Amino acid sequence: MINMTKQVSKILAGLFTALFAGSLMASDAPAVGKDLTQAAENIPPAFHNAPRQGELPALNYVNQPPMVPHSVANYQVTKNVNQCLNCHSPENSRLSGATRISPTHFMDRDGKVGSSSSPRRYFCLQCHVSQANVDPIVPNDFKPMKGYGN
């Protein structure tokens, strides 16, 4: 009798597991590749106190990437789309009045200049960052090189 109860318990547990797993498998699969605009990596973090659009902030050292003088909230920069180039590409900068991307952005790792931006320089926000008008979290005693900065 005890053996039979154990067997029935195992069978019932197996049935419930199969039903539960079956219902999970039957549910709709996520729409991969269809609409990724709400994927976690495509939702930008909140950015507060962006400076007003205006002149470029001063550089602090030689070869510093220029800082972005406007908000880039909701800008899409992915392997397929780079919204920065809507204004900053050589063709569009003439119309938009935006700063043209540097010729160095067209060089590959061997120094050869191509007709389009190099993959190494395509993701603008790796180096060029927006600034915010906030108090520093920690004191900063950095002094810009002579001839640079404010």
From Swiss-Prot:
Its main location: periplasm. Heme c 1 binds at H70, C84, C87, H88. GO terms for molecular function: metal ion binding; molecular adaptor activity. GO terms for biological process: anaerobic respiration. Binds 2 heme C groups per subunit. InterPro entries: Multihaem_cyt_sf (IPR036280), NapB (IPR005591). Keywords: Electron transport, Heme, Iron, Metal-binding, Periplasm, Signal, Transport. The keyword Ribonucleoprotein does not apply. Residues 1-26 form the signal peptide. GO terms for cellular component: periplasmic space. It comes from the Bacteria. It is found in: Periplasm. Heme c 2 binds at H105, C124, C127, H128. Electron transfer subunit of the periplasmic nitrate reductase complex NapAB. Receives electrons from the membrane-anchored tetraheme c-type NapC protein and transfers these to NapA subunit, thus allowing electron flow between membrane and periplasm. Essential for periplasmic nitrate reduction with nitrate as the terminal electron acceptor. Component of the periplasmic nitrate reductase NapAB complex composed of NapA and NapB. PANTHER family: PERIPLASMIC NITRATE REDUCTASE, ELECTRON TRANSFER SUBUNIT. Belongs to the NapB family. This is Periplasmic nitrate reductase, electron transfer subunit.
